[in-house]
């Protein structure tokens, strides 16, 4: 069972309250449907594409974040530092590692590195984590939709190359029901100094 909700509205400070409502609401629904003796909390996965990256020569396959990307990474840390995140995953590239580093530093959590071409390995690790955990994932414009689909969410198109402001909250209930909420955060305008060619 999959339910897909798509909110295209942009949030700044209120988004933290909205995220809290989503997380608490998912927990309440799971507790209500569980038996009195065995209440199982849902698992929540927060996914983003890496932040904006620098324009680099074609031979450089691993660019750093641009100034706009660094700003977005700091915004992620501010938004999610109080969200009860238990684990952080990012691919091996600098742009994904740098996207989650401010958040990892604030929470004093390690960044679990996963191969970009092995999304199935990440999906297995997420499924193996205990119920009730909130997990943060930074991926790429092609891998984020792939991970969402593999976890039981809807089939989504590849994220447009110029979009870095999509935020996905996937909730997996104890009965296997999946709910996806899509939000926008931060700046929506491509900034100078970012690459427009690689995912």
Where are the regions a protein language model picked out?
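Bacterial N-terminal signal peptides
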Residues: 17-28
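Short beta-strand segments
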Residues: 138-140
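Acidic/histidine-rich alpha-helical segments that form the ligand environment
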Residues: 133-135
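Active-site-proximal alpha-helix that buttresses catalytic centers in soluble enzyme cores
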Residues: 34-131, 144-158, 163-173, 177-199
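Bacterial N-terminal signal peptides that target proteins for export
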Residues: 4-19
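Membrane-interface motif at the C-terminal end of an N-terminal transmembrane signal
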Residues: 27-35
